[in-house]
């Protein structure tokens, strides 16, 4: 495989749409391969802006503005890293011959929960929780009665768990409706899901390089308010259950098509596996691979995009812990304790230009002989990180 130098006529250009902490790692890996890198986001000084060859501040939901930038830069690959992007722009760019990763169709289906849930359950035929789509409070009441309490209520379009809640009784319906309505983005619809009292949940990082599908070891994770706070690898599970999980992930990723990494989220209840969601990009819970694998999810993503051979090997057990800000600040900082500099620890400080309550500002990484002990240490150490 040939890697022309950046700024030469035949350079391989990647345009990243969304330049947060995950995108920053993708750009760093692209730089290691000598690719020409362009980072785009809606705000200045986004994390990936500082490591890309060029950066732009653009409203990515503005179809014409985004198309103009794509035409100007003429990227080899367009990598959407967030959901707040004009789908029309991506579809039109693909029609004009640009390569959207993994494809405009896959981005379209996974951009909202209605698209991917309908696709997975009704077209691919994988097992999911019961679900209904609603628009009004009355429709929500009817759907909740039909599915039963408790149930999970989410906007069809939102990210990082925004607007998601568990409704445990009819008296809570209106408050849950208002919470979801506030966060529902470009869609007027909500999804009501059966609450699965799962034993645990995993992310199965699934890679497609156009020739074969490859899996990373399963990643366990804990979420709070729909957003990840801890992850660990490997998640302990029976081989028979892992095979079921891999089959679901393979079926969904094969049906979506395209190259790259897919973060497939699954619920496990006893020996049953339920499909939850899929992201066609590196996954936040996968940051643990920065310390557990020979190649991180970010390096593997790029290799898959390029159609290169993939060699996935876990070299250690480990855990990650997200550090979130508790305050609004125009001059944010992260203070790490001396224990974070131990030989089996690592960290990433994202360098975001401003902080606000709940914004992820850093991640702590720990490796150990067992994932359980790494997680225990991560939970203890993250409490010593401050602003």
UniProtKB/Swiss-Prot annotation:
Any GO CC annotation of this UniProt entry: cytosol
GO terms assigned for molecular function: ATP binding; magnesium ion binding; phosphoribosylglycinamide formyltransferase 2 activity; phosphoribosylglycinamide formyltransferase activity
Keyword ATP-binding: yes
GO biological process: 'de novo' IMP biosynthetic process
Record's keyword annotation contains tRNA-binding: no
Record-listed ATP binding positions: 113, 154, 159-164, 193-196, 201
Binding site for N(1)-(5-phospho-beta-D-ribosyl)glycinamide: 21-22, 81, 284, 352, 359-360
Binding-site positions, Mg(2+): 265, 277
Reactions catalysed, as given in the entry: N(1)-(5-phospho-beta-D-ribosyl)glycinamide + formate + ATP = N(2)-formyl-N(1)-(5-phospho-beta-D-ribosyl)glycinamide + ADP + phosphate + H(+)
Biological role: Involved in the de novo purine biosynthesis. Catalyzes the transfer of formate to 5-phospho-ribosyl-glycinamide (GAR), producing 5-phospho-ribosyl-N-formylglycinamide (FGAR). Formate is provided by PurU via hydrolysis of 10-formyl-tetrahydrofolate.
Assembly mode: Homodimer.
Protein name per its UniProtKB record: Formate-dependent phosphoribosylglycinamide formyltransferase
């Amino acid at each position: 495989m040939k890697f022309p130098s950046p700024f030469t006529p035949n350079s391989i250009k990647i345009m990243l749409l969304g330049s947060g902490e995950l995108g920053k790692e993708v750009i760093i890996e692209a730089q290691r391969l000598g690719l020409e890198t362009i980072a785009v986001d809606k705000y200045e000084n986004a994390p990936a802006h500082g490591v890309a060859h060029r950066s732009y501040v653009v409203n990515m939901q503005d179809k014409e503005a985004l198309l103009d930038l794509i035409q100007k830069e003429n990227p080899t690959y367009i990598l959407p890293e967030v959901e707040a992007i004009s789908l029309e722009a991506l579809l039109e760019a693909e029609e004009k011959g640009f390569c959207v990763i993994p494809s405009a169709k896959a981005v379209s289906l996974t951009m909202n929960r209605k698209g991917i849930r309908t696709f997975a359950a009704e077209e691919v035929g994988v097992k999911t929780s019961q679900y209904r789509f609603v628009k009004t409070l009355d429709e929500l009441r009817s759907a909740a009665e039909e599915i039963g309490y408790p149930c999970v209520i989410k906007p069809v379009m939102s990210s990082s768990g925004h607007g998601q809640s568990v409704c445990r009784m009819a008296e809570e319906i209106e408050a849950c409706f208002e919470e979801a309505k506030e966060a529902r983005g470009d869609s007027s619809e909500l999804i009501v899901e059966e609450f699965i009292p799962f034993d645990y949940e995993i992310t199965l990082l699934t890679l497609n390089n156009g020739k074969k599908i490859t899996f990373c070891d399963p990643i366990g994770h804990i979420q709070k308010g729909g957003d990840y706070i801890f992850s660990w690898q490997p998640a302990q599970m029976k081989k028979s259950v892992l095979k079921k999980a891999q089959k679901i992930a393979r079926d969904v990723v094969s049906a979506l098509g395209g190259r790259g990494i897919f973060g497939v989220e699954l619920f496990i209840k006893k020996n049953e596996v339920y499909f939850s969601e899929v992201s066609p990009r590196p996954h936040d819970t996968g940051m643990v691979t920065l310390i557990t694998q020979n190649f991180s999810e970010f390096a593997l993503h790029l290799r898959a995009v390029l159609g290169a051979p993939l060699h996935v090997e876990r070299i250690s057990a480990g855990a990650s812990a997200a550090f979130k800000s508790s305050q609004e600040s125009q001059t944010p900082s992260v203070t790490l304790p001396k224990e974070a500099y131990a030989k089996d620890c690592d960290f990433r400080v994202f360098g975001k230009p401003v902080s606000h309550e709940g914004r992820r500002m850093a991640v702590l990484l720990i490796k150990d002989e067992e994932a359980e002990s790494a997680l225990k240490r991560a939970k203890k150490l993250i409490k010593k990180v401050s602003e």
